[in-house]
UniProtKB/Swiss-Prot annotation:
Belongs to the tetrahydrofolate dehydrogenase/cyclohydrolase family. Pfam families: THF_DHG_CYH, THF_DHG_CYH_C. Pathway: One-carbon metabolism; tetrahydrofolate interconversion. Transmembrane segments: none annotated. This is Bifunctional protein FolD 2. It comes from Deinococcus geothermalis (strain DSM 11300 / CIP 105573 / AG-3a). The lineage of its organism: Bacteria, Thermotogati, Deinococcota, Deinococci, Deinococcales. The gene is folD2. GO terms for biological process: L-histidine biosynthetic process; methionine biosynthetic process; purine nucleotide biosynthetic process; tetrahydrofolate interconversion.
Length: 289
């Protein structure tokens, strides 16, 4: 048996088409502002990709490329000005930040109504209360991907391997609110395979190449691989992207997301969908004044 591939491209296109149609009904194109500190190649690439995709779907995108030496006070002052600007609908601070800046202080400074990453404590609390608006992009994108391919969630035994505040924890919360029975495991879970073999739906976000092997997966399960790891090719050759799930798992699973090309496109699509939603909610709030 070879698993059905759950490619992110078609699902991301569908999500973006919905967001574009909603954006067209707004008085002005939603504006996403992204802040990047320094010239880390990965951060530069990520922001460039988000900026390009935002423009493709008709959003206004503004990028602040700030020096790595920017102080925390200067960054917080810029965020305060963006919070007060009614033409700005979404604010994203590209992580990681330089060591001299406190990440949580920065993320907490963003107006929760413009927090399109879904990391502000207020938005985290709303998620766990079962009434999320701006949801973290990767977990929300995963749910959309599953829905797009008709993968059931309600009533399923879901195992989330990974407990980060960006993916693992919020994904567990979203799955709970979709009536899955959820277990959260991690790299220190004893006998991890015994836990993962119970899963109808296995989501892995640890950042450890090929952590999940075929013997750890129940035959026919759906496997969502969130990991993106750079590993050297055979003989020290060119680095390749690989996931947290070994390729051989595709011979056991019923459905699986590829790496690359699985969850990655969904994260960007959900970011832009969140920007449109933020603009809609802000417009509704202004109309109610």
């Amino acid at each position: 048996m070879t698993a059905r591939l759950l490619r992110g491209g078609p699902a991301a296109d569908a999500l973006l088409a919905e967001a574009t149609a909603r954006a067209a009904r707004l008085p002005a194109p939603p504006q996403l502002v992204m802040l990047r500190l320094g010239e880390d190649p990965a951060s530069v690439s990520y922001v460039r990709g988000k900026d390009r995709k935002a423009r493709e779907v008709g959003l206004k995108s503004t990028v602040y490329a700030l020096p790595e030496t920017t102080s925390q006070a200067e960054l917080l002052d810029l965020i305060a000005r963006l919070n007060a600007d009614d033409t700005v609908n979404g604010i994203l601070v590209q992580l990681p930040l330089p060591l001299h800046i406190q990440e949580q202080a920065v993320l907490h400074a963003i107006d929760p109504r413009k927090d399109v990453d879904g990391f502000h404590p207020l938005n985290v609390g709303e998620l766990w209360a079962g009434r999320p608006a701006l949801r973290p992009c990767t977990p929300a994108g995963i749910l959309y991907l599953l829905d797009h391919y008709g993968i059931p969630v309600a009533g399923q035994r879901a195992v989330v391997v990974g407990r980060s505040s960006i993916v693992g924890r919020p994904l567990a919360g979203l799955l709970l609110h979709r009536d899955a029975t959820v277990t959260v495991a991690h790299s220190r879970t004893p006998d991890l395979g015994a836990v993962t073999r119970e899963a109808d739906l296995l989501c892995v976000a640890v950042g450890r190449p090929h952590l999940i092997t075929p013997d750890m997966v129940r035959p026919g399960a759906t496997v969502v691989d969130v990991g993106i790891n750079r590993v050297l090719g055979e003989g020290g050759g060119k680095a390749q992207l690989t996931g947290d799930v070994a390729p051989e798992v595709a011979q056991v699973a019923g459905a699986i997301t590829p790496v690359p090309g699985g969850v990655g496109p969904m994260t960007i699509a959900q970011l832009l969908a969140n920007t449109v939603l933020a603009a809609e909610l802000q417009a509704k709030g202004r109309a109610a004044r």
